[in-house]
Swiss-Prot record:
Organism of derivation: Oryza sativa subsp. japonica (Rice)
Family annotation (Pfam families): PP2C
Protein name, per record: Probable protein phosphatase 2C 29
Enzyme class: hydrolase
PPM-type phosphatase domain segment(s): 44-353
């Protein structure tokens, strides 16, 4: 009953921090937003988003309570519908199942992911006759949860969670800076660019020599999609839908499937927090396409906390500009939609881990203001004062 009381008061207080698209952001760039710094049960967190697509396909949310902290980053593809659906349902399901089970566990997270997938698939099956495009909409899904000193990371797709932790190994090898902060990847990229993922798919589909194809130097499942696990992408999980409809065979699914070629079963990592653990970076692949794990961790470790998520976004944009041989200032003036030619939507949540090192989060650093982006807060304390992106 104690766990039930800890979770139930938080289950229906979802406050939207703005409306999606336009407005806010740093001077000269209306497509970036951030929550500079707020408190959670184990420290502080910082959030930032940069829109590149015509419709923002990334979604993010943070839940804060005395019992637990949840972080979600959802990177949509084919449209924003799946990511928005996950943003609406997943945390409620995690809270519901955690209350029933007496707390968060790997089983709770897997069950919540599975129920979210089932609900979205059911919604698609109702909608596709009037909106066939919805069959090809999907979302990567990355969730982090902290409860009772344990960190859980559940993942579908290629969004990524990277821990920054202090290492004492340098002294043993005669190097300076024995307490430097080093990265530890907490999630697995379900992307066929990874040879292990390609091998896994080939083993699951031994009778399909075209299960993964390299087109223009990029590996894709059936030559179509790079990620192997997601919420949605119903046309790649329910072959019977396309088989029964000639029109869909010509448009949405122009190839026969013997069986589903994608999965919604998450990879889940459980880790007891340790005194040397400093922070976790949760981000969509828009960040990781531009920055290595090492570079991202070094930026956070060497920067002030306030606005650190935005600092990562700007570093990614700088790298995108360098790759395209254009000035960073030019990217900041490019409209949504066109900006996708330079970088993807980028979403970053940096979660600092103070309490496990004997230091509580600082409530006086909570700040927020209105901004039109779908960054959600589920904190009970935010019912009358929702988390809102800060004008930077």
């Amino acid at each position: 009953m104690g766990a039930l009381r800890r979770w139930l008061p938080c289950c229906c207080c979802c406050c939207r921090g703005g409306g999606g698209g336009g407005g806010g952001g740093s001077v000269g760039d209306g497509l970036v937003w951030d929550v500079a710094l707020k408190a959670h049960a184990s420290g502080d967190y910082s959030v930032a988003v940069a829109q590149a697509n015509e419709a923002l396909e990334d979604q993010a949310q943070v839940f804060v309570s005395p019992a637990a902290t949840l972080v979600g980053v959802y990177d949509g593809h084919g449209g924003p519908e799946a990511a928005r659906f996950v943003n609406k349902r997943l945390f409620s399901l995690i809270q519901e199942f955690a209350a029933q089970s007496g707390g968060i566990s790997a089983e709770v997270l897997e069950k919540a992911f599975g129920e979210t997938e089932e609900e979205f698939v059911a919604s698609v099956q109702r909608s596709w006759p009037s909106q066939p495009r919805i069959l090809s909409v999907g979302s990567c899904c990355l969730v982090g949860a902290i409860e009772d000193g344990t960190l859980y990371v559940a993942n579908l797709g290629d969004s990524r969670a990277v821990l920054g932790r202090r290492s004492a190994a340098g002294a043993a090898h005669g190097r300076k800076g024995k307490n430097r902060v080093v990265p530890e990847r907490l999630s697995r990229d379900h992307n066929v660019a990874d040879e292990d993922v390609r091998r896994e798919l080939k083993e699951l589909h031994p009778d399909d020599s075209h299960i993964v194809l390299n087109t223009h130097g990029v590996w894709r499942i059936k030559g179509i999609i790079q990620v192997s696990r997601s919420i949605g992408d119903v046309y790649l999980k329910k072959p019977e839908i396309c088989k029964s409809n000639p029109m869909l065979q010509q448009t949405i699914c122009p190839f026969p499937l013997r069986r589903p070629v994608m999965s919604a079963v998450p990879t889940i990592k459980t880790r007891k927090l340790r005194p040397g653990d400093q922070f976790v970076i949760f981000a969509s692949d828009g960040l990781w396409e531009q920055l290595t794990d090492e570079a991202a961790v070094a930026i956070v470790a060497g920067s002030p906390r306030r606005g650190v998520a935005m600092r990562l976004v700007r570093a990614a944009q700088l790298e995108a500009a360098r790759k395209k041989d254009v000035k960073y200032e030019r990217i900041r003036t490019i409209e949504k939609g066109q900006r996708r030619h330079f970088h993807d939507d980028i979403t970053v949540v940096v979660l600092f881990l103070d309490k496990c090192r004997g230091k509580a989060g600082r409530g006086d650093e909570i700040d927020g203001t209105d901004g039109p982006v779908d960054v959600f807060s589920l904190s009970p304390d935010d019912r009358e004062d929702p988390t809102r992106p800060v004008l930077r």
